[in-house]
Swiss-Prot record:
<comment type="similarity">
    <text>Belongs to the imidazoleglycerol-phosphate dehydratase family.</text>
</comment>
<keyword id="KW-0456">Lyase</keyword>
<dbReference type="GO" id="GO:0000105">
    <property type="term" value="P:L-histidine biosynthetic process"/>
</dbReference>
<dbReference type="InterPro" id="IPR000807">
    <property type="entry name" value="ImidazoleglycerolP_deHydtase"/>
</dbReference>
<keyword id="KW-0368">Histidine biosynthesis</keyword>
<dbReference type="InterPro" id="IPR020565">
    <property type="entry name" value="ImidazoleglycerP_deHydtase_CS"/>
</dbReference>
<dbReference type="InterPro" id="IPR038494">
    <property type="entry name" value="IGPD_sf"/>
</dbReference>
<dbReference type="GO" id="GO:0004424">
    <property type="term" value="F:imidazoleglycerol-phosphate dehydratase activity"/>
</dbReference>
<protein>
    <recommendedName>
        <fullName>Imidazoleglycerol-phosphate dehydratase</fullName>
        <ecNumber>4.2.1.19</ecNumber>
    </recommendedName>
</protein>
<comment type="pathway">
    <text>Amino-acid biosynthesis; L-histidine biosynthesis; L-histidine from 5-phospho-alpha-D-ribose 1-diphosphate: step 6/9.</text>
</comment>
<keyword id="KW-0028">Amino-acid biosynthesis</keyword>
<dbReference type="GO" id="GO:0005737">
    <property type="term" value="C:cytoplasm"/>
</dbReference>
<dbReference type="Pfam" id="PF00475">
    <property type="entry name" value="IGPD"/>
</dbReference>
<dbReference type="InterPro" id="IPR020568">
    <property type="entry name" value="Ribosomal_Su5_D2-typ_SF"/>
</dbReference>
<keyword id="KW-0963">Cytoplasm</keyword>
Amino acid sequence: MTAESTRKASIERSTKETSIAVSVDLDGVGKFDITTGVGFFDHMLEQLSRHSLIDMRVMAKGDLHIDDHHTVEDTGIALGQAIAKALGERRGIVRYASMDLAMDDTLTGAAVDVSGRAFLVWNVNFTTSKIGTFDTELVREFFQAFAMNAGITLHINNHYGANNHHIAESIFKAVARVLRTALETDPRQKDAIPSTKGSLKG
């Protein structure tokens, strides 16, 4: 993580189901140290870090003897909280971004407003219930938890795709790329809050 960055935060969250520790640096270079016990999910979070350039450390222990649900959802909660904490008042950020991202057979669009208002629009249809041992429905559960706790409006639209691994990966990469743009410091706004309300607290 960069020595100059002040947009850093750490969150620890423990329940009877999971124990999560997350650290982020919004002005990083996409370094990651991620261990959740869920291999496919680790791979997706690595994509999120690498392509957003947010340095991430995620250590999660959960009740995987039951299933992956609590671990994935609670990681989304903690990661969202860490990003919200690192953003503070959200001064000087670009705020908005959208893009379509191609990955082989798949095209996925993501749009974000780092507004302080939490909302998820999800237009994705996986054609199988699992990718390996990972439940595909947990991709939505992660982004629902992430958006609600980061305080962002997030729209995710998979336009087409035949391979479910590619669909999932394109979602994480597309979200990463719009976060990279929206969380950047805008040199023309400096310390201004990018809202006519004067606040991005929701």
